[in-house]
């Protein structure tokens, strides 16, 4: 596989990642009907909407209260998931921005320094996703 094909595959992987919105709030809210779930709350902070679910988990006669915090942007894209057990602090489990940055940084390693190739690659990226790539493609040149 040549470098160009490898780059296109990486770009397509990033676009596919961007297209997936993640688990949606309405899917999570139905969990309240399960006996383990004790609380579900939602709130807004700046441009993010948070959905917080609390449930109990029993393992070998030890019960823990687990709280999951899902953060969404206004386009209903899941941005991050954090978890806390009992009274501990939240620990990030998943972060869209960090994953996307890692994928793009991996792409940059393979990008040629040739402006013509970069311009050709830019034409292959759908318009909706050009903002995701634009600053990184400038850096590569």
Question: Predicted segments — roles?
Answer:
Residues 82-90:
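Short, solvent-exposed aromatic-acidic interface loops
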Residues 62-65, 89-98:
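A short, polar/proline- and glycine-enriched secondary-structure boundary/capping micro-motif
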């Amino acid at each position: 596989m040549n470098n160009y094909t490898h780059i296109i595959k990486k770009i397509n992987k990033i676009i596919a990642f961007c297209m997936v919105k993640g688990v949606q709030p309405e899917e999570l809210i139905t969990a309240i009907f399960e006996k383990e779930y004790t609380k579900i709350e939602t709130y807004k902070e700046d441009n993010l909407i948070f959905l917080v679910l609390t449930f109990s988990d029993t393992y070998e006669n030890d019960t823990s209260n687990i709280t999951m915090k899902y953060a969404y942007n206004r386009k209903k894209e899941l941005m991050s998931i954090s978890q806390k057990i009992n009274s501990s602090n939240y620990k990030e489990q998943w972060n869209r921005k960090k994953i996307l940055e890692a994928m793009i940084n991996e792409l940059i390693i393979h990008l040629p320094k040739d402006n013509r190739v970069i311009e050709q690659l830019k034409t292959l990226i759908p318009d909706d996703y050009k903002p995701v790539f634009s600053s990184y493609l400038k850096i590569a040149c």
